Amino acid sequence: MKVRRQVLGDEYVDAALASVTPLTKGLQDLIAEFVWGAIWTRPQLPLKTRSLINLGMLTALNRPAELKLHIRGALNNGCSREEIAEALLQSAGYCGVPAAIDGFRVAREVFESYQPEQQ
C-alpha cells in the first residue's frame, strides 16, 4: 500500500478504498496485492521507469481514465513533462497517431490541473 500511496497519492487511494463494495472487493484485493504489492515493489525497475511503461500501455489500450491517473503518478514519481510527452510520442509509432493524440489530450488536462500532494 505504501508504493500505491506514493505513486497515486493518499487522496486517490483513500477514495478507492472507501468505494469498495462487496461486488468490487475481490478486484480491489487483486489490485492491492498483485499490481501494487507484487509488481510495483520489484526492485529491478525504478518507479519512474514503471510509470513511463504504463503510459505507453495505457495509451495503446485507449484507457484515458487510467492514463490520467498514471500521468499524475508519473509526475509524482519524478517524470518531467518532457519525458511524459516523449513516452506519448513514442506510442504514436507503435500504437498509432490517434491513440497518441488522445494521450496528449489527457496529458494536457493533467498538466493544467496537477498539484503535487503534500507528503
Feature roles, as predicted:
Residues 97-101:
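Substrate/cofactor-recognition hotspot
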Residues 82-86, 102-105:
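A glycine-rich phosphate/pyrophosphate-binding beta-strand-loop-alpha-helix module
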Residues 31-35, 52-59, 87-92:
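Short alpha-helical scaffolding segments that buttress acidic/His motifs in well-ordered protein cores
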Residues 73-77, 90-93, 109:
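Short basic/hydrophobic patches in alpha-helices and adjacent helix-turn junctions
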Residues 1-48, 76, 102-119:
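Acidic, glycine/proline-rich low-complexity segments that act as flexible tails and inter-domain linkers
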Residues 7-10, 64, 78, 94:
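Residues at alpha-helix boundaries and the short loops/turns that link adjacent helices
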Residues 52-55, 59-85:
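Mid-chain, well-packed structural core segment of small domains
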